[in-house]
Amino acid sequence: MKLTCVLIVAVLFLTACQLTTAASYARSERQHPDLGSSDQNSKLTKRCLGSGETCWLDSSCCSFSCTNNVCF
């Protein structure tokens, strides 16, 4: 009888620990969406413009040379 009670308490304790961990993991995923998949991160990565592409600033071109709104 004592052993059964100890086992039941242990199982309940471990279940509570898992539920707490799962809830905190899901909460941290919502708070830090930028730590998501690498596909999402690659979409957010700014790339430079190649030769012949339309530009507005020198810094947006890979060569840092924007003349008449075209990268050189």
Curated annotation (Swiss-Prot):
Belongs to the conotoxin O1 superfamily. Pfam families: Conotoxin (PF02950). GO terms for cellular component: extracellular region. Expressed by the venom duct. Residues 1-22 form the signal peptide. Its main location: secreted. This is Conotoxin VnMKLT2-0221. GO terms for molecular function: ion channel inhibitor activity; toxin activity. Residues 23-45 form a propeptide. It comes from the Eukaryota. It is found in: Secreted. Coiled coil: none annotated. The keyword Lyase does not apply. Residues 26-45 are annotated as: Disordered. Disulfide bonds join C48-C62, C55-C66, C61-C71. Keywords: Cleavage on pair of basic residues, Disulfide bond, Knottin, Neurotoxin, Secreted, Signal, Toxin.
